[in-house]
Amino acid sequence: MEHREWFAPEEDKDYIKSLLSTHTGIIWKAIETVSGQTAGLFIVVFPGKNSENLGYDIGLPEAELCSVAHMDTVAVHPNFRGYGLQRLLISQAEEALRKTQYRYLLCTVHPENSFSHSNMEKLGYTYIKQALKYGGLPRCIYLKKRT
């Protein structure tokens, strides 16, 4: 995988299985219709009051932590990059979350990942701060607050 350091260390098949089996995450997949190949995927995580909740990093009150959704992981196959698939997947997830209690949409982006920084800003996310996350890795935290 290109730029492995842009991803958190725990993002593997076991991580995904755990999210699905505990109902603490949802996955969106984009499938190329002719070949059936996975073009991209996007994971949303519902951290609750887990210590990894990015709400703690931005100073949300305890009562708001269960309103946080992590716009967690996006991966687009190299053959499908450049078509806006990352933004499309995130937009689909946001639409699905629109009528839920999740008002604080938070994500992290590696400081050198200019593509994701640009996409998050185009989607209306605001840069909040840089912090060390995932065992000491530098990450920029973005927030989109829904009313």
Where are these regions (language model features)?
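Conserved active-site alpha-helix within GNAT-family acetyltransferase domains
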Residues: 87, 99, 111-129
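Conserved catalytic-core motifs of GNAT/GCN5-like acyltransferases
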Residues: 47, 108, 121-140
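Conserved acyl-donor/pantetheine-binding loop and adjacent beta-alpha core of acyl/acetyltransferases
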Residues: 37, 43-73
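Active-site rim helix/loop that mediates acceptor-substrate recognition in acyltransferases
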Residues: 5-33, 43
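Conserved GNAT acetyl-CoA-binding A-motif
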Residues: 97-109
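Conserved beta-strand-loop-alpha-helix junction that forms the acyl-donor binding cleft
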Residues: 78-81, 107-117, 134-136
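A short, internal acetyl-CoA/4′-phosphopantetheine-binding micro-motif in the GNAT/acyltransferase core
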Residues: 31, 59-61, 71-81, 109-110
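Conserved acetyl-CoA-binding loop-helix of GNAT-fold acetyltransferases
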Residues: 76, 82-95, 118, 122
